[in-house]
Amino acid sequence: MIQFKDSYKHYGANGREVTALQPLNLEIHAGEVFGIIGHSGAGKSTMLRMINRLEEPSGGHLLINGQDITVLDRMGLRALRRQIGMIFQHFNLLSSYTAGNVAFPLKLTGASDAKINARVAELLAWVGLEAHANTYPAQLSGGQKQRVGIARALATRPQILLCDEVTSALDPQTTTTVLQLLARINRELGLTIVLITHEMDVIRRICDRVAVLDTGRLVETGLVTDVFLHPQHPTTRSFVMETEHIDTSALDQDFSLVNGRIVRLTFIGTDTYLPLLGRVARETGVDYNILSGRIDRIKETPYGQLTVALSGGDPVAAQAAFAAAGIHIEELRA
């Protein structure tokens, strides 16, 4: 649906050229939730805003439904933007009351008052704000403001929804509510959602696939289950470790206090709940010492990770038994 073909972005600054996004080749599929993660300055916002040409690409091609949007004239660009909704980090609401904010993009299309009023009422009910139609933004909580922003973004019935750090200004409980609403939008309305964030936990909870940016370069991309559980690039690994609150120095200290081969076992799906560790220990005579562990979900898929020290018995046979059971093994210390 969305294709970046050698798309890049340069800026002029103080007489020199600065590269915000290096040539990028990537496809975002229709109907998926696609996440873009990176630290500040990685090029996330630039990449997102190129999709609706709030940022003009410096070169390359960017296709939406097969159409190269880099060559659109003003009228074509206006038509494109009606198919793309956008939600902002800091809400960007007008000072008018809630219903007025949602009605604003519809007024720009020239819709009749009757159609506008009906659509606004429908959207406010959909995001759970029907009781706040005549409330001003200053009277709303952060989560309510973001829901107004979501309703406004949906007003013109877009095919694509762009989300610019939509949860970074929210508390954890409100973040969960907003992510659940976005998941419902994707599930029930079939919208393609592209979101940027610096939090791997947001990617884990809502996205189907993810792209990792580092200083303007695409360094890793794939299914969230693959990228999250088996990160390849150092930037990706750092995001995952931040999410799991892993202190590498403390981990090294823990490792120094135990004997044996140290491995990380990753279980996905229903295997997460099977007593495989005990069974393999009995079959191979291996003693195990659990150093850390967690069970969580990537979107709807359960997964578990255990870091264990294996000693005695036959640790090589134990690792082979885990592999035969479909468990991914990462050797941390031989």
Swiss-Prot record:
EC assignment: the record states: 7.4.2.11
Q: Which residues form the signal peptide?
A: none
Domain of life (superkingdom): Bacteria
Query: Gene3D superfamilies under this entry?
Result: 3.30.70.260, P-loop containing nucleotide triphosphate hydrolases
Give yes or no: UniProt keyword NAD: no
- Which positions bind ATP? G38, H39, S40, G41, A42, G43, K44, S45
Which keywords annotate this record? Amino-acid transport, ATP-binding, Cell inner membrane, Cell membrane, Membrane, Nucleotide-binding, Translocase, Transport
User: Which parts of the sequence belong to the ABC transporter domain?
Assistant: 2-240
Q: Function, please?
A: Part of the ABC transporter complex MetNIQ involved in methionine import. Responsible for energy coupling to the transport system.
What family name appears in the similarity comment? Answer: Belongs to the ABC transporter superfamily. Methionine importer (TC 3.A.1.24) family.
| The protein's name | Methionine import ATP-binding protein MetN
Organism (species): Xylella fastidiosa (strain 9a5c)
Taxonomic classification, please? Bacteria, Pseudomonadati, Pseudomonadota, Gammaproteobacteria, Lysobacterales
Gene name? metN
